[in-house]
Amino acid sequence: MKKQKTTTQKPKLTYRVNEQIRVPEVRIVFQDGTQQVMKTIEARRMAEDRNLDLIEVQPNAEPPVCKLDNLGKLLFKMDKRDKDLKKKQKTTTLKELRFHPNTDKHDFDFKTAHLEEFLRKGNRVRATIVFLGRSIIYKDKGLELAERLTERLSCVSNRDGDPKFEGKKLFVYFEPDKKKIDAFERIKAKTSGPAPAPAPLPVPAPEQKETPE
């Protein structure tokens, strides 16, 4: 079997051009901003004289608005614009770290440093506060921890909604904020230079199973 050739799809032109424009009159907008209403046949002739194309940009206007431009260059600009937009659209990955309502200061600082690093790289993060055994009676501690996380990560993110309980877990989501991250990076660069990467995370232990009491 012959392999099918893959072809790059060119951007589709939304409006009509040249002979496709069949209305009697059009309004031409020139590069200097001036406008002129003329017969379509005259506008096409003008475009040909200038080695340009007559391109309709506002088909619903009365009469339709057109401009004189190079169709090939216009398609190239549209293609470049689409590629630039795709480059800017980064896929967001959800990163998660687990806490307990009685998480000590060292563990809290260690894990929030990693959450902060994830956010600075443009990732969405989820902090999961796990209540083991009868610790679910200390929901207030979990909510206090969620507020501490929110305050600590506020320099690079925004909390996405309120903390939510599901069974014996409390979920807190954070979205990266580019403006905050840029400001944070500038301040950090001025004060201490490039920030060292946080220590590697340990391999998480299997979640403990509850035993009947």
Curated annotation (Swiss-Prot):
A Pfam family: IF3_C
Composition bias, Pro residues: 195-205
InterPro entries named in the record: T_IF-3_C_sf, T_IF-3_N_sf, Translation_initiation_fac_3, Translation_initiation_fac_3_C, Translation_initiation_fac_3_N
Record-given protein name: Translation initiation factor IF-3
Subunit and partners: Monomer.
Function comment: IF-3 binds to the 30S ribosomal subunit and shifts the equilibrium between 70S ribosomes and their 50S and 30S subunits in favor of the free subunits, thus enhancing the availability of 30S subunits on which protein synthesis initiation begins.
UniProt entry keywords in alphabetical sequence: Cytoplasm, Initiation factor, Protein biosynthesis
GO CC terms, sorted: cytosol; membrane
Protein's UniProt keywords contain Transcription: no
Organism: Chlorobium limicola (strain DSM 245 / NBRC 103803 / 6330)
Gene Ontology MF terms in the entry: ribosome binding; translation initiation factor activity
